[in-house]
Amino acid sequence: MDAEEPADALHIANSIPAHIDSLEASSDEAEIAIADAEAALNSAEGELALSNAERLAEAKEAFAKGDAPLAKGLADSLAREVRETSDAMQEVQRALRQKKQISDRFPTGQASQVWQSRLEEVETAASSGKWLNASQSLTSLTNDLASYESEASEARELLDFVQSEWLSLIHI
């Protein structure tokens, strides 16, 4: 009887209900994640929905095979990516509708061409459906433009100060 190790057997038997509860919870979480991913995919447009339909099928297949953690991971990843891409798409489309206001902030002269080409890169990425790249390029462009405007404003203030000081020295 000592060879049977009844204490270990009792310990294992007592842990089974907790393990089953854990599996059920994992299964419930996976079902919710798959439903969320499906909803996100249904709200997605065009190519985004088509390119991710296979990933949703993989999540459902993993769930059907009893691999709830894999199914949940795949579904969560899919839902997150679809939402990020949709958000990026909306941000870029909104900005491109205001393209004229963005272009009006560009400096004049040769520097304007550099800024214009950066805006065209955003448009190219958007037209090819690379919304995350377009969003990153747009963010970089607007941050750099804000920085440029700040530096230009500081330079103008310094120039105004120097000119006023120069005029006061001339009139002494």
Regions found by a protein language model. Name each.
Residues 170-172:
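Conserved small/polar residues in nucleotide/adenosyl-binding loops
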Residues 116, 131-134, 145-146, 160, ...:
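C-terminal modules of long, charged coiled-coil scaffolds in eukaryotic assembly complexes
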Residues 26-44, 87-108, 151-166:
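Disulfide-bonded cysteine-rich modules in secreted/extracellular proteins
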Residues 1-34, 64-93, 129-156:
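Repeat-associated, polar segments at repeat-unit boundaries in modular proteins
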